[in-house]
Each structure stands twice: as structure tokens, then as C-alpha cells.
Amino acid sequence: MLGVLELLLLGAAWLAGPARGQNETEPIVLEGKCLVVCDSNPTSDPTGTALGISVRSGSAKVAFSAIRSTNHEPSEMSNRTMIIYFDQVLVNIGNNFDSERSTFIAPRKGIYSFNFHVVKVYNRQTIQVSLMLNGWPVISAFAGDQDVTREAASNGVLIQMEKGDRAYLKLERGNLMGGWKYSTFSGFLVFPL
């Protein structure tokens, strides 16, 4: 004979009904519940994907956006390294953008999206700005019109990064004497690999 507790559990399970999708290929969604999956054929797959399960968590979110909010000319540090520094971080989800060095450090292997917009102000020189990955240029952008007071070098790219890889902007040609207010540098993890 079934005990009272067992009857209550059976009744609750019957009322809740089965967790199901519309068809066999649709995932089962159990909102607010923990689902434990056991593999009857375990392997030594270190990635944990032997079952074909992809797990996303809040810690997988990675994004940053930094701007230049003042029109100060480059500092001694900028003149020496030619790295383009940003003085205000608007978004830094995951804390992977080092604001002191204006460098993004990849927290995991994945595909990342970057874009930049570097404004030159009252400067008749052509500038070349490059997105650097571990010290090597990936993409560049140019601004060289001598008849305008403000012009921007802009570009964007998707790149594969390994954990610990560093991305930053470098002034490869010209100077930013006059400042670079309104310049931006942003990036985010598109998906992990």
C-alpha cells in the first residue's frame, strides 16, 4: 500500500504533467528548475559536451564599451606606446576591459566582435588606427581629409581569440594632437568555442 507521502508526490507529478516540447527535436524547458542529466555511456570528453548539451550561464556574458570623454591631447604614455587610451568605460560586463591600459583580455576561447571609431580633431595629418591582437595588427582604418575639422577612422571585425589574448587600438600613423574626444572602442563575445 502506498504511503501518504508517496501519494502526495504521485499526485503532484500527475498535476504538473510531463515536461515536453512540441516535437522530439524541440528542447525541454523547465523554467526555474534544475535538470540533472545522467549519461549511461560516459566518456572522458573533457569539454563536457559528450551528450551534445550546451550550457549557458550568466558568467558567459562578455561585453565592453569605452569612450574618450575629453579633448586632452595624448599623454606621455600615449606618445611612447602609441596605444589609444579611453578615459571612461560605459560597459564592462565580465570586467575583461583593463581601463588603465585600454586593453581587452579574452576570458575564454571564442569568436569576438570589435568595432572602433577614432575621431581626429583639427588635425591635417592622415591617421591610421589599427586593432591589435597580441601586438599584431588585425585591421586598420584611415582618416585623412585635410578640409574638415573632425573626421573618424572606423572599422569592425569578428576574430577568434584564445583565453588571455589581448586586443587594443594603436595609432600606427599620424598623431592625435588636438585630441580624440567622442572616440569609441567596443567589443563583445559572440559565442564561445
UniProtKB/Swiss-Prot annotation:
Signal sequence segment: 1-21
Keywords, in A-Z order: Cell membrane, Disulfide bond, Glycoprotein, Membrane, Postsynaptic cell membrane, Secreted, Sialic acid, Signal, Synapse
Major subcellular site: secreted
GO biological process terms, semicolon-separated: cerebellar granule cell differentiation; chemical synaptic transmission; establishment of localization in cell; heterophilic cell-cell adhesion via plasma membrane cell adhesion molecules; maintenance of synapse structure; negative regulation of excitatory postsynaptic potential; negative regulation of inhibitory synapse assembly; nervous system development
Region (Essential for interaction with NRXN1 and linker of two C1q trimers into disulfide-linked hexamers): 34-38
General function of this protein: Required for synapse integrity and synaptic plasticity. During cerebellar synapse formation, essential for the matching and maintenance of pre- and post-synaptic elements at parallel fiber-Purkinje cell synapses, the establishment of the proper pattern of climbing fiber-Purkinje cell innervation, and induction of long-term depression at parallel fiber-Purkinje cell synapses. Plays a role as a synaptic organizer that acts bidirectionally on both pre- and post-synaptic components.
Outcome following mutation: C34S: Abolishes hexamer formation. Abolishes interaction with NRXN1. Abolishes GRID2 interaction
GO MF assignments: identical protein binding
Record PTM text: The proteolytic processing to yield cerebellin seems to occur either prior to the secretion by presynaptic neurons and subsequent oligomerization or in some other location after release of the mature protein. Sialoglycoprotein.
Subunit structure as annotated in this protein's UniProt entry: Homohexamer; disulfide-linked homotrimers. The trimers associate via N-terminal cysteine residues to form disulfide-linked hexamers. May form oligomers with CBLN2, CBLN3 AND CBLN4 prior to secretion. Once secreted, does not interact with other CBLN family members. Interacts with GRID1. Interacts with NRXN1 and NRXN2 long (alpha) and short (beta) isoforms produced by alternative promoter usage. Competes with NLGN1 for NRXN1-binding. Weakly interacts with NRXN3 short isoform and not at all with NRXN3 long isoform.
InterPro entries per the UniProt record, alphabetical: C1q_dom, Cerebellin_Synaptic_Org, Tumour_necrosis_fac-like_dom
Known glycosylation sites: N23, N79
The C1q domain, residue ranges: 57-193
Cellular location(s): Secreted; Postsynaptic cell membrane
Tissue specificity comment: In the Purkinje cells postsynaptic structures. In the cerebellum, cerebellin is much less abundant than [des-Ser1]-cerebellin.
Name the record gives this protein: Cerebellin-1
Stretch list, region Essential for interaction with GRID2: 122-147
Gene Ontology CC annotation, any one: glutamatergic synapse
Annotated spans, Necessary for interaction with CBLN3, and homotrimerization: 62-193
